[in-house]
């Protein structure tokens, strides 16, 4: 046993030392996301005392507008950057995406100027005021960052990207805290910090190497080649972009529904609860996703028979990793939020309880979601995401119709968990894995963990009362 353990450790160390290996790339990316997550969690108690739920709600509305417009403006071509084997086709994809971003900037400037007031009234976000005019610029910078992020992923420059992520987080959080401290928590502090973070990321990625290749983008410019790659990767605007948009919309539905049904304060509570749930997800998932997408694509092209096993191994590891932490936040979320962030945010802790175990399967899905793209089965991803949107809309509408915020969010969390679980099982089925066995094991483990933690909570409550 000791010999086997030693061999396992030595093999792991060897993989970490191997330049360009999956283990080394993951370790580098993980270190960057870990630093960002730790920073985010460390400043959260301060942020909640500088900015109230209403400021967080308006900030969530602004970001929802930016992310939705951004997805449409590039037609979803950026994720295809990994696929071309010839550099000329890759550069043509970059040119296409940048051209779409520039065109969108002009159209947005006109549209947002004409429809500012009706949009703000519909979203009940009049307090954004002049910040609404910043949306086109924020979308443009966001799009360029997406392009450069995909470029770094193609070149496997994970170390440089990890450093950029840390610098961006420090810059954005520092400005947000400073403005909040001086201005008593206006929504402008959150918006200014976020915009500064986007600009910091843009400058850092551009001048960390890509600026030397800008001439290469201009020189081989050809409308014929651009139209050719646009058609070759047409499944991205037809399937990937709608899927990404629906996925984005699925996460933002509470922002729009709760704004109209319960006000921006409720939106702020939801936005803050999900921002903390996203921290561990970003810590693990965002470290895994880019590296694993590159690895899965490479494996399918060279050794397709190995794809099934590497997906299953990663799925199991992520599932086990998230089981207990998200279980704790599910059962003890209201206590944790009240103690750390204050009584004003206790309801946000209740929301995390409704969503906690959905995030277990979201974390595990980082091992399955790339499979649709790798197998070129994006239409199935679109169906799954559309189903997620439908069940979430139904859940929130029921909460609004009954004037019961807690009921709406509880159904939102349960329906999200069910659909995500079914999509994961569908992907494992496509890989010809024993789905029924895997599904039964997952259900038993989740049920046992919840029973144990709820029993512990009842025990603590009993002793506190006594």
What are these regions (language model features)?
Residues 2-11, 18-76, 100-118, 169-173, ...:
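Signature of the first transmembrane helix
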Residues 3-18, 187-191, 204-251, 294-309, ...:
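Interhelical loop/hinge segments that connect adjacent transmembrane helices in multipass membrane
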Residues 5, 20-37, 62, 67-117, ...:
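Membrane-water interface segments that mark the loop-to-transmembrane alpha-helix transition
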Residues 25-40, 168, 172, 190-213, ...:
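Transmembrane helical elements of multi-pass membrane transporters/channels
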Residues 53, 116-135, 305, 309-312, ...:
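Interfacial segments at transmembrane-helix termini and the short loops linking adjacent helices
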Residues 71-89, 154, 273, 277-315, ...:
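Helix-loop junctions and terminal segments of transmembrane helices
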Residues 80-89, 141-167, 181, 188, ...:
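Membrane-interface junctions at transmembrane-helix termini in multi-pass inner-membrane proteins
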Residues 129-136, 162-215, 386-391, 405-428, ...:
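Hydrophobic alpha-helical transmembrane segments
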């Amino acid at each position: 046993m000791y010999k086997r353990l030693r061999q396992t450790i030595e093999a792991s160390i060897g993989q970490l030392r191997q330049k360009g290996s999956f283990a080394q790339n993951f370790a580098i990316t993980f270190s960057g996301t870990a630093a960002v997550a730790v920073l985010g969690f460390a400043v959260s108690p301060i942020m909640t005392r500088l900015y109230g739920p209403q400021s967080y709600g308006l900030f969530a509305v602004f970001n929802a507008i930016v992310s939705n417009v951004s997805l449409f403006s590039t037609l979803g071509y950026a994720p295809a950057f990994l696929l071309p084997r010839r550099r000329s086709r890759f550069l043509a994809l970059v040119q296409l995406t940048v051209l779409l971003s520039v065109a969108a900037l002009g159209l947005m400037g006109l549209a947002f100027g004409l429809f500012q007031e009706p949009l703000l009234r519909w979203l009940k976000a009049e307090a954004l005021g002049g910040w609404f005019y910043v949306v086109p610029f924020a979308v443009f910078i966001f799009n360029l960052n997406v392009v450069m992020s995909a470029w770094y992923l193609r070149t496997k420059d994970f170390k440089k990207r990890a450093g950029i992520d840390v610098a961006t987080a420090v810059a954005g959080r520092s400005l947000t805290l400073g403005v909040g401290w001086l201005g008593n928590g206006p929504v402008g502090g959150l918006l200014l910090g976020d915009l500064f973070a986007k600009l910091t990321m843009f400058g850092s990625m551009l001048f960390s190497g890509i600026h030397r290749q800008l001439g290469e983008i201009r020189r081989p410019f050809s409308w014929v080649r651009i139209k050719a790659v646009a058609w070759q990767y047409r499944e991205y605007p037809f399937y990937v972009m709608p899927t990404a948009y629906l996925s984005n919309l699925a996460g933002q539905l509470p922002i729009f529904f709760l704004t109209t049904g319960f006000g921006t304060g409720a939106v702020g509570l939801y936005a803050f609860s999900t921002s903390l749930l996203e921290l561990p997800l970003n810590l693990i998932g965002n470290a895994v996703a880019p590296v694993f997408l590159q690895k899965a694509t490479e494996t399918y092209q060279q050794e397709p028979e190995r794809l099934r096993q590497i997906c299953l191994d990663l799925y199991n590891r992520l599932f086990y990793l998230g089981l207990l932490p998200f279980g704790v936040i599910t059962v003890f979320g209201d206590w944790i939020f009240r103690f750390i962030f204050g009584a004003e945010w206790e309801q946000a802790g209740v929301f995390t309880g409704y969503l906690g175990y959905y995030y277990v399967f979201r974390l595990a899905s980082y091992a399955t979601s790339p499979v649709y793209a790798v197998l070129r089965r994006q239409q199935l991803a679109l169906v799954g995401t559309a189903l997620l949107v439908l069940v979430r809309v139904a859940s929130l509408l029921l909460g609004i119709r009954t004037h019961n915020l807690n009921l709406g969010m509880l159904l939102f969390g349960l329906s999200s968990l069910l659909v995500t679980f079914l999509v994961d099982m569908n992907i494992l089925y496509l890989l010809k894995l024993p789905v029924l066995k895997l599904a039964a094991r997952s259900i038993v483990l989740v049920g046992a963990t919840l029973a144990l933690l709820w029993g512990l909570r009842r025990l603590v409550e009993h002793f506190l009362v006594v």
